[in-house]
Amino acid sequence: MSFRLRYAPSPTGFLHIGNTRTALMNYLFAKHYNGSFIVRIEDTDLARNVEGAIESQFENLNWLGIYPDESIFNPNDQKYGKYMQSQKFDRYKQLAEQLVDQNKAYRCFCTSEELEKDYEDQTSKGIIATKYSQKCLFLTQDQIQKNLENKKEYSIRFKVPKNKTWTINDIVRGDVSFDSKDLGDFVILKSNGVATYNFAVVVDDYDMQITHVLRGEEHISNTPRQMMIYDAFNWNYPMFGHLTLIVDNTGKKLSKRSGNALFFIEQYKKQGYLSQAIFNYIALLGWSPPGEQEILSQNELIKIFDEKRFSKSPSTFDMVKMKWINSVYMKKLDDDKYLEFVKSFINTNKFDITSKSETWLNHLLLLYKKELEYAEQINDHLDLFFNKNTLDNNTIDVLNNLTNYKNVVEIFKNQINVLKDWTIENIKQIIKDTSTLANVKGKDLFMPIRIFATKSEHGPSLADVIYLLGKTTVLNNINSLER
């Protein structure tokens, strides 16, 4: 059997961590078994569809390295039908009417007001799990015909079998059972002719010969309704699997309101995360590789993927770990690719890099290669080289706690003043000579030099920073602070 798995987004929003994880796990599952990964669009909720959402979904999937074998852009319509639900209305209607003819579904002429009153009556009686009253199930043929002649609007409801239990061997959770007594007759075709989610998704999965349905746990409650529809048509079920929730650091479901994490993939792109790093990290949400290694390429993940290693517990989205993994991938870039990538994230409205040579800028950016968690972070470090810094009270307190810092600075300044050949090696030698002449080392040596020469407590290699700032700037910094 050739495995066929799908990711089926609705164009009601943009690609985020949750549906990226769904797409990615289906992709790994399919590719591990040399199967097919399909992307189809569930766009029947016309009122909520967002312009540009479909294009954005595909653009971001491709950016992550997730390329569908079949989609609206590379369909196999002749064999598997359409890849957008809005192009299958006739198919859904024909199958819904077929179930009516077979007495497995029926026309419901109840208005929304009647349904609302019915549910309110049930709630007032203490019924929590309200169900449809089946009022229209018992209409006579004459009553039905009269309603049709009067052009009364109707939906089509599925007739839930009585006293039946369905059990699935969930890929993630093991055996899960559902009882028909917990479910009321549900709509499969709305009065406007649009199929409901549970009906359309079954038809689509059957038409596309989907073998495994791997999705979020919020869909567990949909599964029994879908199994009933499979049974009604005498179709075989796919294998079902329901991935556990992704939660934020407070234990709540990750969402765009989660303050500690970026939610949308587009946000990561704009901040300068690498697609390979995001793919790697999201693959670890609710799934664990064998062994201790966590930095894994797409090909490695495909090779070692095992559906038995899904977690049954919620996975916590850890922004610190996401940043760490991205920093590992940043370090792995060769210097040319790193420079090209990071330069594209420099805020040129704030920092005039055109006034500097390419050699100077490359030297500066490479100083931070081992420090950056994401590319846009470079802007946090550039004030040191482009803007005039001022010392805060904390930095002044640091100086006052050092041994004889004024003497250290004076010795260093005098040597810098007479330095003719401005090289990193010569600057390192001056720092070394200052240590000997002032009889200090460690923090008592480096901190006063760094603060006075660069006007900052922190930074990368001191000699490199001094070299990049230039002799004039370094002496101006020292003189301004001495005053």
From Swiss-Prot:
Check the record and name the Gene3D superfamilies matching this protein: 1.10.10.350, HUPs
Q: Subcellular location, in the record's words?
A: Cytoplasm
The UniProt annotation places ATP binding at 256
Question: What keywords were assigned to this record?
Answer: Aminoacyl-tRNA synthetase, ATP-binding, Cytoplasm, Ligase, Nucleotide-binding, Protein biosynthesis
Biological process (GO) annotations?
glutamyl-tRNA aminoacylation
| Location, primary (coarse class) | cytoplasm
Report the PROSITE patterns cross-referenced here: AA_TRNA_LIGASE_I
The UniProt entry, under SUPFAM superfamilies, shows: An anticodon-binding domain of class I aminoacyl-tRNA synthetases, Nucleotidylyl transferase
Q: CDD domains this protein is in?
A: GluRS_core
Q: Which catalysed reactions does the entry list for this protein?
A: tRNA(Glu) + L-glutamate + ATP = L-glutamyl-tRNA(Glu) + AMP + diphosphate
> What stretch of residues is annotated with the motif 'HIGH' region?
9-19
Instruction: Show the GO MF annotations.
Output: ATP binding; glutamate-tRNA ligase activity; tRNA binding; zinc ion binding
List the InterPro entries hit by this protein, alphabetically. Answer: aa-tRNA-synth_I_cd-bd, aa-tRNA-synth_I_codon-bd_sub2, aa-tRNA-synth_I_CS, aa_tRNA-synth_I_cd-bd_sf, Glu-tRNA-ligase_bac/mito, Glu/Gln-tRNA-synth, Glu/Gln-tRNA-synth_Ib_cat-dom, GluQ/Sye
Query: What sort of enzyme, by top EC class, is this?
Result: ligase
EC number per UniProt: 6.1.1.17
State the oligomer form and interacting partners: Monomer.
The free-text function statement in the UniProt record for this protein reads:
Catalyzes the attachment of glutamate to tRNA(Glu) in a two-step reaction: glutamate is first activated by ATP to form Glu-AMP and then transferred to the acceptor end of tRNA(Glu).
Q: Which family does it belong to?
A: Belongs to the class-I aminoacyl-tRNA synthetase family. Glutamate--tRNA ligase type 1 subfamily.
Q: What is the name of this protein? A: Glutamate--tRNA ligase
What organism does the record attribute this protein to? Answer: Mycoplasma capricolum subsp. capricolum (strain California kid / ATCC 27343 / NCTC 10154)
Chain's gene name: gltX
